Amino acid sequence: MGALSVRDSSGVQIVSNPATVRGDSGCVSVDSVPMLTIGGAGAEGSYDLLRASGALRLPDGGVVVMNGATSELRFFDHSGRHLRTVGRLGSGPGEFRRPGAPLWFGADTLVVYDTWTARATFVSTRGGLLKSVRIEGVAGGGELLGRLSDGSLLLAIARGVTEGTEPGVRRDPVHLVRLSTEGVVRDTIGSFRGPEVAVRIAESSTVMTGAPFSRRTFFAAAGDRVFVADNAEYRVRVYANGRLERIIEKSVEAVPITASDIEREKAQRRGSGRDPSWLAWLDRLYQRDQLPASFPAFGRIVVDAEGWLWVSAYAPSPGGGFAWDIFDASGRLRCTCQLPSGFRVREVGRDYLLGVGSDADGVEQVRLYGLRRSAQGAH
């Protein structure tokens, strides 16, 4: 696949992109120095971040951060000064047990989904608690992906460990459903392959953990479109109003998993573990003939404020950092952008990029970078 090709198959547009963009001069550029940094070594109180699961930039230039370790939604102004905190650990109204990232629900409203209680909490951008809604028919788990243009919410529901779950590596289905703002399931968009997990049966429990070099399906919502991307291959499916509209492909060469890759990941997972039965299970899990031959085709996806699709590489580039492929709204690959290694993108606006990284001491920070779009990157 050496050149861009666009074809139609039974009413579905298939956009096949080459591995690189000819004459790629960069459709976007990201500043090397952040405009705003929150957290890091020496930070105290509300500025001390741990397991920041998400962040959004507010209309007034401020930032809201979900600090997962304390189940708090923290609001900061445009200079990084802490303004207020909403929520705490608990199961009551305005409290969270296992909160996900804050998501937009309208121009002045945020929504946070608690996977432990299967409850969506709506909060104003000024920090006021608006309402909490229990999702009907959902026992827990899942991930809230965003709001669609018709006002419905998009929720991915996966099955957890249940009685009778067999040991081994598996990919159970994830069901993508649309919800009303009252927590009622309207319809199901589809069922897709979930994350690849390894199931271990211990003496008194069943444990599920990520499989080595795990394949998984990523989801994103933007306007009336839903993006579904299984990184077993470089292919992103785009649904509009519940119907498959477009498939975006890119030509990539499989990157083989080497013996050193296996040993490095195994050592990271082993850590300081000493339990003999667990170590024996880990050895079996990482046997060469039990592993895939190559890495997943990509890392994750994000849809920006212009409706463009960003797809990250699975592994860092040789010089450090991660390459992100950027596709326009028609599915055409426009350019590739390098971002710092370890920086987890949470939101891409028209002129900014917001995410979570670590400082030189390994302490979490939320960082806001300026982003410029060239003529070819402007909508």
What are these regions (language model features)?
Residues 1-379:
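Eukaryotic scaffold repeat domains enriched in small/polar residues
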